[in-house]
Amino acid sequence: MIDINYDFPSNRPARYFDKLETSFTFNKLNPSPIGTRFVATQFWLDPTNGTGGGDTMYIGINPTVQSYNYVGQAHFSYFGKNAGQLYNSNCNKGADGGSGVTCALNLPTTQGYTYHLTVNLVESTAQHAVLSGTVDVLNATGDPVQTVEIGKFEILRGNMALSFPASWVEGSSDPCASLVKTGITFSPLIVTYFNTGGTDKYTSPINTVPSNKCGVNATPVGVRMDYGR
């Protein structure tokens, strides 16, 4: 596991957004990238009254693994007991064997491509929240390839917003010596603060890469990750 934290200074709190944008570029990606199972940004669906007790969510990319015919997917998931209506056929009730929602879109990954993922809090009322997750795929020259909704669903909790984002690379049980060379650029996170009509945005740079299992070279290009051999 490689963890990535973002910089939120005191005048830019890390909570209460209605939009979150995160981007990953696969600079070096083997057709069967041993040790790279999931590249994602995790965050909370958080009560806006400050009481805490929010629910975990994430959005991310599972790279293609040709060695066992896995095409690759984009995921948008909610972990909690308050799932409501599902508005996209990519979505199903349940998340990692527990309660929640998992939306999965078949999406092959390509070396050199960027995957720009957006979470929108479409609606937040006293009764519920509606959220959507989309992916914009850009080719190696930055030209758009496609834009697809990963999923859209309702959460039966009122007065909620997005908070406390962090990113990570989920590895595998393979020994460190067997990892193949992988290079990923994590771009700065873009958030839009809740109830500002889309006008109050903050671009949050990478702060730290606090933990990793097998060693990683991190350089400030966004943050570019190189690991394996």
Where on the chain are the PLM-derived regions?
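Secretory/extracellular carbohydrate-interaction modules
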Residues: M1-N88, V101-A104, N195-T203, P210-V216, ...
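Short beta-strand segments enriched in hydrophobic/aromatic residues
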Residues: F24-K28, L121-E123, V137, G171
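Aromatic-enriched hydrophobic runs in primary sequence
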Residues: Y78-N82, K93-G97, Y115-L117, L179-V191
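Extracellular Ig-like/FN3 beta-sandwich strand-entry sites
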Residues: F17, G112-T114, H128
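Short, aromatic/His-centered strand-loop micro-motif at the edge of beta-sheets
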Residues: S89-H116, S124
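Aromatic sugar-binding interfaces of carbohydrate-active proteins
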Residues: Q127-R229
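Residues within well-ordered beta-strands of beta-sheet-rich folds
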Residues: E21-T25, T114-N120, S132-T134
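A generic structural signal for short, solvent-exposed coil/turn residues
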Residues: A14, Y68, T125-Q127, N159
